[in-house]
Design a protein with these regions (language model features):
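Membrane-proximal ectodomain caps of single-pass cell-surface receptors
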Residues: 1-119
Length: 119
């Protein structure tokens, strides 16, 4: 079965488990993808950024983890597309991933010695 012309895919609330396949990018005509409110795990495949026609994305309320991929269409979605995935990080979510630029704040000054924490 070929799904090349598929424009909208809504599989929300289906108790789906496992990972999102990288082959999702083969759905090049997809405008809307809703996989919310399932039990999907693992990372979001970077190949999803190759779906240039994507104008709606909801991956919220799953168990996704890792850094949100960046690129073309993915940069246009806000945090609601990814919310309630506690182990997901990166733009546009407020929680940064390990390895992202961190800053030091001085929390205590003992003479010339600074003790800091990372944000």
């Amino acid at each position: 079965m070929e799904l090349n012309g598929l424009i909208s895919l809504n599989l929300s609330r289906n108790l789906l488990t496992r990972r999102i396949t990288s082959e999702i990018s083969l759905l090049e005509s997809l405008n809307s993808l809703d996989l919310s409110k399932n039990q999907l795990c693992g990372g979001i495949p970077s190949s999803i950024s190759r779906i240039n026609s994507l104008s709606f994305l909801s991956l919220s309320n799953n168990n996704l983890s890792g850094e949100i991929p960046t690129g073309s269409q993915l940069n246009t979605f806000n945090a609601t597309s990814y919310e309630v995935n506690p182990s997901l990080c990166g733009f546009p979510l407020p929680n940064k991933c390990l390895g992202e630029e961190m800053t030091w704040n001085s929390v205590e000054n003992r003479g010339n010695e600074h003790v800091g924490i990372q944000e």
